[in-house]
Amino acid sequence: KKNSIWSVGKASVKEIDKINILQASLLAMKRAIKKLKKKPSHILIDGNKIPDLKNYNLKAIIKGDQKIASISAASIVAKVARDKFITTLAKKNIGYSWDQNFGYGTKQHLKAIKKIGINKHHRKTFSPISKFKIHNI
């Protein structure tokens, strides 16, 4: 814990729809790295892509969350942050059952979208969503 530093970076739904999920993930990583209070000697990233950042020692590790404890920990931090965000959305956006499905495209969630439509928190470029008539935005 003493030698650990972390931050969470985010990308908006509009950014994801505009630049795609991969580029938005890289943008969120970049934001998280830039928010760190101290520049780390190296940064390990789960996957095969790294954000475009000069003057940082970045290394992508495929399946890194299964191989490296610090990457596993980062995955948990990211999941907890996302779940907290989704829980907040669920309280403000009744009807989508986000408190149960956490924003994943479950049958229940898709049924709710068919009934009440999508809102500004839905990614319009996500395949199941893009098939629905867009309203309630």
Where are these regions (language model features)?
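RNase H-like, Mg2+-dependent phosphodiesterase core
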Residues: K1-I137
